[in-house]
A protein has these predicted regions:
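Surface-exposed binding/hinge segments that line
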Residues: 104, 148-190
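Ligand-site clamp/hinge motif
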Residues: 226-269, 409-411
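Structural transition elements
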Residues: 327-365, 388-393
Length: 528
């Protein structure tokens, strides 16, 4: 019994020692984790202190820092962070107030705009209605990329110290989207010629950064201490001037500048394919097929639907553009908040054939035909293309081949420049391959106005949206417009270009933006 008691006590001691050991081990682990957490926090503090607050950019073929006069792409991009408009656009192209505090459409052609006069210029003076009037009046007298924005303004009246009235020569749907041009200081140009004055070397602005130096080879921007509407990480931006784009690309390749933007589909031939971060944003150049919906055959929406599904857009992009374009079906499919839900327009010859068969078309005698209104209708139409545009001719050839695979007969009309313009202006075509530079405005009257599509509901909605300011209602109406578009297929969207944003791997933050403002997220950029 004594032996058993000793053994029992011994086992208890071993168990107690084991438990104590576990407690010590757990305590040690907890202490190590706490130590590691402290070390990480200290490391993070060091990293925060080591964040680079200066970046380097480039401008090729510099002209002027006056944003109303400049025709330079890089200047127009960079001046978005120096000067501000009455209204600006968000990342999804929604209009928001900037220098304007409030606005109202008081009649078809009249607008009241209240200015936020608490905003300061970088020299410390307050923004005034006189600055806005000064800008618009000078803009109307010069050759500017923004001239079209104010073309319909016939009068600008000062209502009071913070309000102006704009009167247009006609109703312009969504005119407020035109008021996105930069506003300049009247005082800054007092006694000077607007085009040749010395202030154009470094015009003051209300934006996030200000020009502190503009020499023959570089421009330096620093934080605008009077800008109070955001916390900025970057404190200095050095902009080098280059004689040509190739020189600027080479400088980026060597790491001398941190970011470039381009829609050059051959950019990789200049900067290579590795050693930098790449982001893409939708471009503005949109190619599509315009359709004469009054044509006896093309008036049938199932024919238009079938044509759309029979076109291999991806193959065209690969063959013609080397994969450097994107498929696009609709005029707002560049990321616009009003674009609505996309339809399936992917290439499928079988689907195209099925659509025709389901709607009474019969493939007979090597052609699609249907007996309609006492006569046999045959799907056989002409596709007009501009002969001098070799790229579009190549596209048209592929489209013709695609459609013929589905049994759809097409005759290409390769028109001279004058003939092509006449076809386009007079709508004297069955179908025409064309394209547009897309607007920042969601106004679709260019495409759906003038009876281009006989749809009473669509016409009614188009009249309604001109005067809707409530976002949820506007979105509801545009959702319905897209549904009608998807069903009716009054146009056949093909593809659009895109911008490539190449950045140094040490540049951090949310770099992708949109083609309105690549610096829209600059608040959180930094170097690491």
């Amino acid at each position: 019994r004594n032996d058993m008691k000793v053994k029992s006590n011994f086992a208890k001691y071993i168990f107690i020692i084991f438990i104590i050991g576990i407690i010590i081990l757990v305590a040690y682990k907890l202490n190590e984790e706490k130590k590691n957490t402290t070390d990480e926090e200290q490391t993070n503090v060091v990293k925060e202190d080591d964040i680079g607050k200066e970046i380097k950019l480039g401008i090729a073929e510099f002209d002027t820092m006056n944003p109303l006069l400049s025709k330079n792409k890089q200047v127009q991009e960079i001046t978005k962070i120096i000067y501000e408009p009455l209204f600006q656009l968000t990342s999804d192209y929604k209009l928001e107030k900037c220098l304007a505090k409030d606005w109202a459409k008081t009649a078809e052609n009249k607008y009241l705009i209240k200015i936020d006069t608490s905003i300061k210029w970088s020299d410390g003076n307050n923004l005034s209605v006189d600055d806005v009037i000064f800008t618009i009046e000078n803009l109307s007298k010069i050759d500017s990329i923004y001239l079209e924005n104010i073309r319909h303004i016939t009068e600008i009246n000062r209502v009071d110290d913070n309000t102006i009235r704009l009167i247009l020569d006609q109703e312009v749907p969504f005119f407020e989207y035109n008021l996105i041009f930069p506003i300049l200081s009247k005082k800054n140009y007092e006694g000077q010629d607007f085009i040749y004055g010395s202030s154009n070397n470094a015009p003051i602005g209300t934006g996030k950064y200000k020009i502190t130096q503009n020499s023959s080879d570089s421009i330096i921007l620093e934080k605008n201490e009077n800008y109070k509407r955001a916390e900025l990480t970057l404190e200095k931006i050095t902009i080098s001037k280059y004689s040509n784009v190739g020189e600027m690309y080479n400088s980026f390749k060597l790491g001398k500048i941190d970011l470039i933007t381009t829609n050059n589909i051959g950019i990789e031939n200049y900067i290579g394919t590795i050693g930098y971060n790449k982001a893409e944003t939708n471009g503005r150049e949109f190619d599509f097929l315009a359709i004469n919906t009054q044509n006896q055959v093309l008036a049938n929406k199932e024919v238009r639907q079938a044509i759309s599904r029979a076109i291999n857009r991806e193959s065209i992009i690969s063959q013609v553009y080397g994969g450097k374009y994107r498929t696009q079906d609709y005029f707002l499919d560049y990321g616009n908040w009003l674009q609505g839900d996309k339809a399936d327009t992917s290439y499928n010859t079988d689907t195209a054939i099925q659509i025709l068969e389901d709607n009474g078309w019969e493939y007979k005698y090597n052609r699609w035909q249907q007996y309609i209104n006492y006569s046999t209708k045959i799907i056989n139409f002409k596709l007009v293309v501009q002969a001098s545009n070799e790229t579009r001719v190549a596209i048209a050839d592929i489209i013709k081949s695609n459609l013929e695979e589905a049994g759809i007969k097409v005759t290409l009309v390769k028109a001279t420049d004058n003939q092509y313009q006449s076809y386009l202006d007079n709508r004297n075509y069955d179908m025409i391959l064309t394209g547009v530079t897309l607007s920042l405005s969601p106004n679709l009257e260019t495409f759906f106005g003038d009876g281009n599509l006989a749809n009473e509901e669509l016409n009614s909605i188009m009249n309604e949206v001109k005067n809707i300011t409530k976002e949820d209602l506007l979105k509801e109406k545009y959702t319905r417009i897209r549904q009608i578009y998807n069903d009716e297929v009054p146009y056949i969207g093909l593809f659009s270009n895109y911008y490539e944003v190449a950045s140094n791997w040490t540049l951090k933050g949310s770099i992708p933006a949109n083609w309105y403002n690549i610096f829209i997220n600059i608040d959180n950029w930094y170097k690491n």
